[in-house]
Amino acid sequence: MGQLSQSQDLGAGLKSRHVTMLSIAGVIGASLFVGSSVAIAEAGPAVLLAYLFAGLLVVMIMRMLAEMAVATPDTGSFSTYADKAIGRWAGYTIGWLYWWFWVLVIPLEANIAAIILHSWVPGVPVWLFSLVITLALTGSNLLSVKNYGEFEFWLALCKVIAILAFIVLGAVAITGFYPYAEVSGISRLWDHGGFMPNGFGAVLSAMLITMFSFMGAEIVTSAAAESDTPDKHIVRATNSVIWRISIFYLCSIFIVVALIPWNMPGLKSIGSYRSVLELLHIPYAKLIMDGVILLSVTSCLNSALYTASRMLYSLSRRGDAPAIMGRTNRSKTPYVAVLLSTGAAYLTVVVNYYAPAKVFKFLIDSSGAIALLVYLVIAVSQLRMRKILQAQGGEIRLRMWLYPYLTWLVIAFITFVLVVMLFRPAQQLEVISTGLLALGIICTVPIMSRWKKLVLWQKLPLQNTR
C-alpha cells in the first residue's frame, strides 16, 4: 500500500494558545464535576490515592505517546503508531474502537447539556436543545480547525477559572479565614472511619471510576498535528501534564474531602463540588454548578466531534475506511468525517428509542473499557516503536523515562486492571462488551482486505507524516 501523509490535506490553523488550552481541557472533563462524588462515596478520603494512581498512569501514557508523536506527528495519533509498530490489524481495530467511543460521547454529553438548559427554560423540550447544541457545534467544526480551537480555548479557559476559584475558596475555608461558614482544618480526612474507611479494595474500585475521567488527554497529539510546529506543542503539553493533573484533580478533590464528610447523605445526587459550595453558603450554588457543568459538557461534545472526525479521516487516508471519509473542504476540514460522525451519534439515539433496552445498553457498555485498551495499545506501540526508530537511525527528541522498565510496568498494570474488571460484577459487562466489539472489528479485517485489496496484517513503514 502507498505511503500517505495523514495530515497533508488538513490545515495548520491551530495556534500555540489553542494547543496549550486544548492540553488543559483534555484533562478537565465533566466527569470531574459529575462523577467525582461517586468515587468519593466509594473510597472516602482515600479517593486521593485513586486519583493519584490514575493520574500517574496518564502521565506515563502521555509521555509514551509524546515520544512517538514528536518523532512522527500525525492526526491519527496512536492508531497510526499501532499500524507501524504492531501491525495494520492493531491500528485498524483501535482506530475504529476509539472513533466509536467518541461517537457515543456526543449524544450523551448533548443530553446532559440539554437537561440543564431545559431546567432553565422548561418550555423547550430536551430533544430540541440537544439537537440545536449538536448542530451548532457540528457547524463550527465544519468551518475550520481554527474555529474549533478558538471555541475550545474559551470553554477551557472558563473551566480553568472555575476550578482555580474553587481551589482558592476552599483553601481560604480550610485555613479558617472564611467568615461565612464555620469550617476549618482537615480533620474530615480521618473523622469518619479514618482515611481509608472501606479498605484498599475500595480505592481500587474508585480508581476504575476515576481512570476514565482522564480520557481525552491524548487529544492534544492529534490537534498538534494541525498546528505549525506540532513537535514543540506536544513537548510543552506533555511536560505540563503533571502539574495540570496535580492542580485540577488532586488539589480540587483534596478541598472536597477536607471540607465535607465522605459519607454525607445525598452526596451522589447533589454532587461533590456543589456540596462544598452549599456548605460555604455560596448563593445560587446549584445554578453556578449547572453553568460550570454545561460549559464542561459543551467542551467535551466539541472535542468529541473533533476527535471522532479526525480519527475517521485518518482511517480513510490509510485505506481502513471508505475514501469519501477523507475528503476535505476549502477550509481543509474533513467535512464528510464530521457529518458521518454526527450522523452515527444520532443513530445511537434512534436505537435508544426504537430498539430493545438491552441493545442500547450493550452499545454503551461496549465503550466501557476502550480507554484502557487505548492506553495498552499506546504502551505496546511505544515499546516497539523505540526499537524501530533506533534501527532506522531516527532521532528521538523526547524519551520515555526508564525505558523499557516503566513501559512494561504500565502494560502489566493495565492488564491487571482489565482482569480485575473482568471479575467485578459492576465492570464485568463493560469488559466483555468491549472485547466482543473489538473481536467483531478484527473479524472484518479479511473482508476489508479483499474489498480494498489491503494487507492489513502487515506493518507500515515508519515515516514522518508532517
Name what the model sees in each region.
Residues 127-184, 215, 238-242, 364-377, ...:
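Membrane-interface loop-to-helix entry segments
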Residues 1-7, 80-83, 89, 110-130, ...:
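Helix-loop-helix connectors at the membrane interface of multi-pass transporters/channels
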Residues 154, 324-332, 372-429, 455-458, ...:
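C-terminal membrane-solvent junction of multi-pass transporters and transport-like membrane proteins
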Residues 1-35, 40-46, 58-63, 75, ...:
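Membrane-interface "cap" regions at the ends of multi-pass membrane proteins
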Residues 74, 97-111, 214-227, 283-323, ...:
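Membrane-helix boundary/coupling elements in multi-pass transport proteins
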Residues 5-10, 47-48, 122-125, 157-290:
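Helix-loop-helix junctions that connect adjacent transmembrane segments
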Residues 11, 24, 34-129, 133, ...:
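Extracellular loop-to-transmembrane helix junctions
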